[in-house]
């Protein structure tokens, strides 16, 4: 089964361009043109990755990302934010909102595919750990153990290290 990727952008030509590139790599693609629809799709579909435009009218990508990462049912889905904003403060804003990666437009195809594959690998490892251990993801953290009454949490960035131990 191929990975399911949600593309969220208010500009349909941008969606179509990404959709063509991703379906050529055999990914299953869903699309949304606004933040509200993106959240609805994320809540009702099994997704492996979200490509999310940062600047959209209404609910912007930063807010969509914040809401997704606050939802324990969605927090484990990696988000790559896409934007024409090049300033580092916008990248920081996206990362603070919970984005897992950031790609600046215009999008280089090689970088896009490499980052998509990297995030999907991390998602696969997270899914394997969750299925194997039965633990859950909460606010982008995986609780793997407890010391006394206190959970020991690891962010998704430490999972490859844990997995290789």
What is each model feature region?
Residues 11-30, 44:
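Two-component/phosphorelay signaling modules centered on CheY-like receiver
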Residues 15, 57-58, 75, 87, ...:
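The feature encodes the CheY-like receiver
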Residues 45-51, 56:
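Active-site beta3 strand of CheY-like receiver
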Residues 103-116, 120:
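C-terminal output helix
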Residues 155-161:
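Conserved small/polar residues in nucleotide/adenosyl-binding loops
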């Amino acid at each position: 089964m191929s990975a399911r990727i949600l593309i969220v952008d208010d500009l349909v030509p941008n969606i179509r361009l990404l959709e063509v590139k991703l379906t050529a790599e055999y990914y299953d693609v869903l699309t949304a043109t606004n933040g509200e629809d993106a959240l609805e799709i994320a809540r009702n579909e099994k997704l492996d990755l979200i490509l999310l435009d940062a600047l959209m009218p209404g609910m912007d990508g930063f807010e969509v990302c914040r809401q997704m990462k606050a939802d324990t049912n969605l927090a484990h889905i990696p988000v790559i934010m896409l934007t024409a904003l090049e300033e580092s403060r916008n990248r920081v804003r996206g990362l603070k909102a919970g984005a897992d990666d950031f790609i600046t437009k215009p999008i280089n195809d090689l970088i896009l595919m490499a980052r998509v594959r990297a995030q999907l690998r991390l998602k696969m490892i997270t899914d394997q750990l969750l299925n194997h251990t039965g633990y859950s993801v909460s606010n982008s953290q995986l609780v793997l153990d407890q010391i006394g009454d206190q959970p020991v949490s690891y962010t998704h960035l430490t999972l490859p290290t844990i997995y290789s131990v």
